Each structure stands twice: as structure tokens, then as C-alpha cells.
A protein has these predicted regions:
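Bacterial N-terminal signal peptides
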Residues: 1-6
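Structured extracytoplasmic
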Residues: 12-154, 162-167, 172-190, 196-199, ...
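Substrate-binding/catalytic groove segments of enzymes
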Residues: 204-206
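M16 family metallopeptidases and their MPP-like homologs
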Residues: 209-211
Length: 256
């Protein structure tokens, strides 16, 4: 009688990994084909909020609120000056583009590692979504430090069943991660992340919430403290071919 539950759990674990792989495949295909750009509101902890407008030439932003109050004329003037500098400085545009490409490359690499980095199991299923849990796989050999930190996490993944897209991924670092015997860096146990994604238009999924709380030290006790809490909302598709000058109009129009 005891063998039946054990076999059921084993089958459940075996069923989980293909679900994760299918979600990863769907995400990578969507990312590869997605040429969309968006205007949206980014709200940060502390009461700051900004309108962001993306274009193929780069993204620009302008404050709406500071510390929970309407942005001051001084802050808006500083934003406008920075926008004009960005519009007329190809080097700034290139740097932003390179940073974005680097982040995208890292995200793709980590996404590819998801199925093999963890031990997966199905927690629950509804007609709309599947909830899975993950924990470190002792047989996983991370190729770099980012993967090493990721591989020490345990947490939850929620997948949309209709489109096989990732809705939620949240995790907690189960043990300290040290680099150079702890002299170069130590990321502390208990560090957490939570990323929420939703369909913002038919077939388009975007990150709508990010919560990252990481602590530790690096390079002989320099403190690591990444604390990020932001919500993105009010997504509107930006027309293809929109120039940066046209994006300024979209930016200011959204703030009215």
C-alpha cells in the first residue's frame, strides 16, 4: 500500500519536467518573434512612477509622481533635458541597446537552464493554470555564477495552460552562495525574487511585477543590497516605426 503513493509522486515529478520544457520553448519562441514596443506606467516602491515609451531606437521615460506626489516642474525639466540629450546622442542609444541585448542574452541562457537546474513537481492544476514547485537539483552543474545562484533557489512556477506561458516565478535562496571562499562574494540565504507576467494584449505577455530582495557582500565586505519592487501597468502598443521624437509626444500625452 505504501508503494502506491511513492509511485504517484514519482510519476508526478516525471510529468512536471515536460511542462517546464514546453513553457521554456514557448517563451523563447515568443521572445525571438516579438518585435513589439510598449508605452506603460512603471510604479516603484517609495511612491515614484514614470511613463516609459519604447521604440526600436531606444526607450525614454518621464516622471509622473515623486514620493507619492505629482512630479515637480524641476524634475520634469530634468527629464525633458535628458530625453533631448538621448535623442541626439547615438552613443547613449547604442549603450542602452547593448545593455538590453546583454540582459536579453542572460535571460535566454537562464531560461534554457530551467528544466535541468531544478527538481520539479506538480503542485496543483486548474483549467487555466498549472502550479509547479522546484528545488535545487544536486546533479546540476552551473556554467557560470548567475546560474549557480539560480540553481540554489527553491520556489514556485505557474504556467498558463492555454498558451504555455509563464505567469509567475518566485524563489528563495536556500543556502548562502559563496565565491572565492566567501572573500569575493557571498549572497545570503533567504534572498528572494518574485516575477509576475500577464497577457497585456492578445498573444503578448509582459512582466507586470518584479520584487527582488538580495543581500550579501562582495569584494572584501562591500555590501550587496539589491532591493527592487516595481509594478508595470497601463500597457499600450506603440506603432511600428515610431521615432524618438514621436515617442516624446506619446510620453507627454500619456501624462495628461
Amino acid at each position: 500500500m505504501l508503494a502506491a503513493p511513492a509511485l504517484a509522486l514519482q510519476a508526478r515529478a516525471q510529468d512536471a519536467k515536460p511542462i517546464v520544457q514546453q513553457a521554456v520553448t514557448a517563451e523563447l519562441a515568443a521572445n525571438r518573434d516579438d518585435q513589439s514596443h510598449w508605452r506603460y506606467l512603471r510604479s516603484e516602491a517609495g511612491g515614484n512612477s514614470l511613463i516609459i515609451v519604447e521604440t526600436e531606437h531606444g526607450a525614454i521615460s518621464r516622471h509622473v509622481q515623486e514620493n507619492g506626489r505629482p512630479a515637480s516642474a524641476k524634475a520634469l525639466a530634468e527629464d525633458d533635458a535628458h530625453i533631448q540629450k538621448f535623442i541626439h546622442d547615438p552613443a547613449m542609444q547604442q549603450k542602452q541597446r547593448q545593455n538590453g541585448e546583454h540582459d536579453d542574452k542572460s535571460a535566454v541562457e537562464l531560461m534554457n537552464l530551467l528544466p535541468q537546474a531544478f527538481l520539479w513537481s506538480v503542485v496543483s492544476e486548474t483549467p487555466e493554470m498549472t502550479t509547479l514547485s522546484f528545488k535545487p537539483d544536486p546533479n546540476f552543474h552551473p556554467p557560470d555564477m548567475e546560474a549557480r545562484v539560480m540553481g540554489e533557489m527553491s520556489g514556485t512556477l505557474i504556467v498558463d495552460r492555454a498558451q504555455h506561458r509563464i505567469r509567475t516565478m518566485k524563489g528563495r535562496l536556500e543556502s548562502d552562495v559563496t565565491i572565492g571562499f566567501g572573500l569575493l562574494a557571498r549572497i545570503k540565504q533567504g534572498s528572494t525574487f518574485d516575477v509576475e507576467r500577464r497577457q497585456v494584449a492578445p498573444g503578448y505577455w509582459e512582466i507586470t511585477e518584479t520584487h527582488v530582495h538580495i543581500s550579501g557582500h562582495a569584494l572584501f565586505f562591500k555590501t550587496i543590497g539589491q532591493q527592487e519592487d516595481e509594478v508595470k501597468s497601463d500597457f499600450t502598443l506603440v506603432p511600428l516605426g515610431t521615432t524618438l521624437d514621436q515617442a516624446v509626444g506619446l510620453l507627454k500625452g500619456a501624462a495628461k
